[in-house]
């Protein structure tokens, strides 16, 4: 019996090659795309789960709250780790601290052959690192590797980069030319699926050597440069531990002498496996993704699969009139309804099986392009995982059942007497159902088109928005505690000798980025008792010229005033609110007190007010900002991390060559590396950019699948109405009349789909845009979005239906009505 069902199914597929191809291709594309999305989602969900104790590892984070600011921080003070060990020994097994010197790049030099590289994935960590995280050592002893000061563990890739085929154990690498570190271990490359990227780790005790001249570097509870992780004991009540963390505020934070009186802190635990998809705090180690986008992608995957199944159901039921006589004859010859059901559902499973195989081939071909688009390294081998093959079998059964159940039930229920007489009205009864399915497809297509357009318009808005400073043709050079910091004026003077280099300045953090620094700067007029943590940017001369910052009152820093380096600050317009003044001019001459963690109060005078600019990313509102000059009598080491060079648009290549030459003359140890500021800022929105590319690609695929179904339906509709078309042409109907007749029904469905999709798209778009403080004028763009998407989907539908409509209209009416 099974052999007979299979033979009939294959024969039916071959007899109707066009419909079979549409069904198989639509399902294959839908399945391949859905599997691709599932692979991406599984990759995102797998972050940090490679640790053997991933269910017991937590990151300790804190939220600082004052009257005018809430700051969610991923980092904590130096001393929090040891305090946690001491305060909660019943809950915590181990703690690990990470510190990156608050620098993006670190230079390591092999003194023997003078090979140096700048590394970004470097941290000082506690010796418990290997006890908490599943970092596998290829060489070295995990219990001893990070025990002593100036010990260094490197990845196997870096071992080859610095030492070639030599054994790296016991060899030295110079850290920034100031300390030699001994390689005590080589670990396997850190997995990609982690919220932290690690290539090198040094012992935390090394900091005592590096900060030997500043013995109190780790005592402040206001300085929060440390990522703190804990391994809770097996069976520990993390809920209870979370609630007990509140006791640390009064006991340690507020007990610190410099703690602002109006500042409160909330400490909480984050499961390490949740960080990548749910955390978006200040000072994250890497740009994280978003669980919202994962849910969106899963919904899109479901939509695509539903689209493909709808196509199958539509085409199967559309052919009901053609197959009704087959059903009638089989029933007259003794066929039972159950047997016919099995035959039709078997055809569905056969189509699905072929589509699965073709879909996997499409998936394998598309995967390299998908990885390039998403910057992933996703692989697919059905034999790598014991669950893959059973999963594909279940998927085949599920899709085959969902896609084929209704057509099988429908076709097997025909009454033989009616269909053999040609009196069956079931074809008409399914019309509403088919139209509903087509409308559903195009509703989702319109939603995807509008959603993709919203993401695209928001990203364009971010890229084009006036940030209040010039980001174009500005080159950023890392300047963190290297020779450039000591020879800054020399480097600047030589750089400016090139005609295409307009200006050079140094600054602590990159404008427009996510990295910020807060210090205790207090307006004097508010009184000694008024505490505040304000955003501070350390700069050198010419910062306003390099970034084209607008001075709206007073003046910028000037070499004509020797006291600027020790006595003067600039503020932005937003800072006026803390000074209780109405105009920028009134702020000039006002006093600002700075209370450093150690040392006496410093007094500064406001010499200028700048127009507000987006110092942080566009996801945040503009905050009060103070610019402090650290050039002149004060060494810039420790304050300036970047050098910004403004280049004339027409001379980029020559200017870069001159910069590289100058760099190597002044600083022969560190490699010359640069980034354009606009490219650097674009990385902040990497997640949104990836989602935009994915949503665009998947929207196109959804529309393609919908069009495949519409193509089949239009073809069958034209075939069913062949005699009607012939009669109409005989009575004088033109080609345009026939095309309009066949297209009208489909265009009505597209119109209904637009009406349904518009309010849904408006709601979803509004919710997504709430993630951005600055966004394009969504309301004003609605007519363009709605009418544009509607027009696009109508053009697509007309193009799809029009081909078969014109083809049907051009048929000789004599041939069309001959059978009548």
What are the functions of these language-model segments?
Residues 26, 326-367, 702, 723-766, ...:
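Transmembrane alpha-helical interface segments in multi-pass membrane proteins
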